[in-house]
């Protein structure tokens, strides 16, 4: 894993004052400078429904610009780091609210206006730097598995194929196929 180049992302977690009336529980976000993906954590099975938690990931470009502004003088625990993190949290939170409010407006019918509800607001938010979020090799069309030169070992996971559960499964299946083929080839000797 040390040889895998990755790109950072900022991850955001918020709680809302009420349920967002949007027709999705997760979405890729297009046309937003700050966000690329959002999901309703509260919609997962077994989650407490009285708290509305959403998570979001920043775009690569936004993360790069924010992290370059942070420079190296913002070590965790310092006032400079907390100021930088508060600014990133605020900007990403506003972008998330914009997306959710637009979703509510688009989802509203004539009889159910969003004007009748409390305005959608964030009650808690926190951003986090996810330093090695997504491998750059995925963007370059990486193999779905990686053979490690140290021996008969395959490294698998979402970092090899796609940054999600489907990528992890695809990667594991590709390694299993390669191992089965190697065993079959040895058996024929």
Range-by-range predicted roles:
Residues 10-12, 34-36, 52-54, 151-152:
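A generic secondary-structure signal marking the coil-to-beta-strand transition
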Residues 10-15, 46-49, 188:
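Low-complexity, flexible helical/coil segments
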Residues 1-33:
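Central helical "cap/lid" subdomain
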Residues 18-24, 44-49, 62-65:
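Short helix-loop capping/hinge motifs at secondary-structure junctions, enriched
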Residues 32-45:
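Short, solvent-exposed beta-alpha or beta-beta edge segments that form flexible loop/patches at the rim
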Residues 49-189:
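Conserved flavin/dinucleotide-binding core of flavoenzymes
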């Amino acid at each position: 894993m040390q040889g895998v180049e990755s790109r950072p992302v900022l991850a955001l977690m918020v709680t809302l004052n009420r349920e967002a009336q949007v027709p999705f529980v997760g979405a890729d976000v297009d046309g937003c400078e700050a966000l690329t993906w959002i999901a309703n954590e509260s919609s997962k099975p077994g989650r407490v429904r009285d708290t509305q938690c959403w998570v979001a990931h920043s775009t690569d470009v936004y993360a790069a610009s924010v992290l370059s502004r942070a420079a190296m003088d913002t070590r965790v625990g310092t006032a400079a780091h907390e100021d930088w993190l508060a600014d990133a949290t605020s900007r990403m939170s506003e972008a998330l609210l914009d997306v959710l409010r637009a979703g509510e407006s688009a989802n509203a019918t004539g009889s159910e206006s969003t004007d009748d509800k409390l305005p959608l607001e964030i009650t808690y938010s926190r951003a986090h730097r996810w330093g090695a979020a997504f491998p750059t090799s995925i963007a370059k069309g990486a193999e779905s598995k990686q053979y490690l030169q140290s021996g008969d070992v395959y490294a698998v996971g979402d970092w090899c194929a796609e940054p999600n559960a489907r990528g992890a499964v695809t990667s594991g299946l590709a390694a299993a196929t390669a191992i089965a083929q190697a065993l079959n080839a040895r058996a024929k000797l």
